[in-house]
Each structure stands twice: as structure tokens, then as C-alpha cells.
Amino acid sequence: MALFDEYLKKGGFPELLTEKNIGKYIDSLVGKIINNDIVKRNKIKYKATLESMINHILNIVPTEISYDELAKLFNISSHHTAENYIDFAEKAYLISICKKWSPKSRVRVGSRKAYPIDVALMNNRKDAFVGDNLGYRLESIVYIELLRRTNPLNQSVFFLKEQRGEADFVVCEGNTVIEVIQVSYDISSATTRKREINGLLIGAKMTKCNKLTLITRHNQESFIENGYTINIVPVYDWLVDC
């Protein structure tokens, strides 16, 4: 438990186990990636704008993003440029983009959510102000692990969001949904527990999937709700259950 909590707060870069100045290390790493893997490789003219956008995204992850809104925020003439900047950041392994699940292709293409490729990038940069939101950090860790587990040839990870509620992740194999996952650091509040379970039930009905999982920091139980079996598992067990 203590080791996981350290990972949750520090991130997964091995160097951070011995690095005394974590902020300096992360700043240097991000700076090198932006300069060498993005700016030089793609001949970016407006480096400062690119850096500001990437830092902005890392400050608000995990969150839905809009290329039009980013273009307006950073005074970029075209949303295509904003889209390219985000694509460059993803290819350089600073962020990862998760698309919205929908039976309609245009919805999947049009909606997206950004995650950090490592939680160390969320709050250890000089321009960071995201703080220690453990719920966001836990959600990001689960997403990173889902990417590791899924086969890119026939499996995908999406998020689900509807007016009635939302589910953090929908895991698909081909066109079939094989699991709906919610992530919540603490479900001791009755309101939080109800919201997370409701998201799973909405996901189950929309996707016709019966495998429903709620990942938390330490809770563990299984029960039936509205005819569906819901499994609540502690994240440290889920992470080692390959």
C-alpha cells in the first residue's frame, strides 16, 4: 500500500526513486522532449505557443479537449494547428488521447479526452498548478495500465459520457464492449458511491456489457444491482491481476 501511494504521488519514472529534485528532473525531461522530439522533428515555428499549450493540457488532465477552444485560447489561426500540436505531444509520449465511445463513428471521431502518459507530469513541472488530486491521478494510472494491457490490433479504450451519467472507461474488442470501468479514489460517501455505480449501470445498458468494475484505493466487494453484478476492487490488486 505504501509503495503504491508513493507511485500515485511521484509517478512511474525509475529515476524518481533516487532523484532528490523531482521538479528539476521532470522539467528537464519535458523540455528535452518538446525541443528534440517535437520542435526540431516537426520544424515548429512558434515554440512558445506549443510549450504553453502542452503545459496547459498537462495542468488540466484528465479532461475533455476541443481543438477549436485550444486554438482560440492560444490565439492560433486554425484548429488544425492545435490538432497537430496535440498529435505531436501524443506521438512524443507526453499525453495520450482517449476517444468517446459511441455506436456512431462521427461521435467517436469528434470527442476526445487527454491523459498524461505518467502522473509525474501532472504536478512536478515548474508551470504545474494541478495539485494533488488523488482521484485524477488514480484515473490516469488506470488508463495508462489499460493501454498497456490492450492489444492495439483489435482492442481499444474509450470513455463514455451521456446526459444521464458517465463511465470512465469502456474497453472494446473489435466492435464488442468487454468491460465497463469506473475509477474512484474514495467511495466512503454515499453520494459518490451512488454516482459511480450509476455510471456503471448506464454504461452496461448502453453497451450491453455485463462485466462492470469499480476500481478504488482499497475497497473490495461484489454485489448485484438492477440485475448486474458489480465488482469493486482495490487498485493495487487490479494492477497486479494481469
Question: What are these regions, as identified by a protein language model?
Answer:
Residues 1-12:
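Amphipathic alpha-helical segments of the small helical/lid subdomains adjacent to P-loop NTPase cores
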Residues 17-177:
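Accessory nucleic acid-recognition modules appended to NTPase machines
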Residues 119, 216-217:
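Cofactor-binding loop segments of dinucleotide-utilizing enzymes, especially the Rossmann-like FAD-
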Residues 167, 189-192, 221-225:
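Short active-site-adjacent structural elements
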Residues 177-189:
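Active-site ExK catalytic segment of metal-dependent nucleases
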Residues 193-208:
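Short, charged, amphipathic alpha-helix that recurs within catalytic cores of restriction-modification
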Residues 210-216:
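Short, hydrophobic beta-strand segments that form beta-sheet elements in well-ordered domains
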Residues 217-242:
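Domain-level recognition of nuclease-like catalytic cores that cleave nucleotide substrates
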